[in-house]
Regions:
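Juxta-kinase regulatory segment immediately upstream of eukaryotic protein kinase catalytic domains
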Residues: 1-44
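Hydrophobic "anchor" residues on beta-strands that sit immediately upstream
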Residues: 131, 170, 189
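Conserved kinase catalytic-core helix
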Residues: 91-112, 140-184
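Conserved protein kinase catalytic core
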Residues: 66, 141, 199
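Conserved ATP-binding subdomain of kinase catalytic cores across diverse folds
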Residues: 27-138, 167
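Catalytic activation segment of kinase domains across protein kinase-like and atypical kinase folds
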Residues: 174, 178-201
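Short helix/strand-bridging catalytic loops that position acidic/His residues to coordinate divalent metals
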Residues: 74-79, 145-150, 195-201
Length: 201
């Protein structure tokens, strides 16, 4: 059991594999999650970091960039709670609770939350590889939205959402235009990629 600020993450170990999910959805998803480990779809190799599972879910595979790309998708293992999939899952869960418990009605109606379904870690001696399965968010990244000018006052709305993040102690050290999704149909914004987030609320 891994504690978050507002709940906990349940982990199951199978040989060298760990499957982890929100304790509050355990009765609903446990069987489906465990069954997914044997699915051909889940074992598809990821060449582009993100893989659309075509069922309302997105699989994010963690891989290195920059000078560390020689390690590819291998990371040093310092305990399950310190792995990147668990860290991102925990941050998503805490952020969801902050938004849901907020009294700021404009923000709660404007933000569409990306839900972490479960995370998956494979350990091999000193290293691990990992994935996280997230609910699929419809829309386009903010850089494409700004280029198309889909919404005139989008900058102001993004600024108000940033203010909400800072007021609640949510700091994303990897925030950029590709980590913000705008859905023109619902007129909602979503923040994604919570791997490098610190929450001090």
């Amino acid at each position: 059991m891994i504690k978050t600020k507002f709940g906990s993450i349940v982990s199951h170990k199978f040989n060298n594999q760990y499957i982890c999910y929100d304790s509050s959805i355990q009765p609903i998803l446990k069987d489906r999650i465990l069954a997914s480990l044997d699915s051909d779809e889940f074992r598809l190799s990821n060449t582009s970091n993100f893989l659309d599972l075509n069922n309302g879910l997105i699989k994010k595979h963690f891989c290195r960039k920059g000078a560390m790309h020689l390690f590819n998708d291998n990371y040093f293992y310092y305990g399950l709670k310190n792995t990147r999939p668990i860290r991102e899952q925990k941050n998503h869960m805490d952020f969801m609770n902050i938004v849901k418990n907020s009294k700021n009605e404009w923000v709660t109606s404007k933000l569409e939350l990306c839900m972490p379904i479960f995370s998956y870690v494979i350990r091999s001696n000193l290293f691990y590889k990992g994935d996280i399965i997230l609910s699929k968010i419809t829309g386009e990244t903010l850089d494409k939205t700004l280029m198309k000018r889909l919404k005139i006052n989008i900058e102001e709305e993004v600024g108000l959402c940033f203010r909400f993040l800072f007021d609640n102690g949510v700091y994303n050290f990897d925030m950029n235009l590709t980590n913000i999704i705008y859905n023109p149909e619902s007129d909602k914004l979503s923040f994604i990629d919570f791997d490098k987030v610190t929450i001090n609320s």
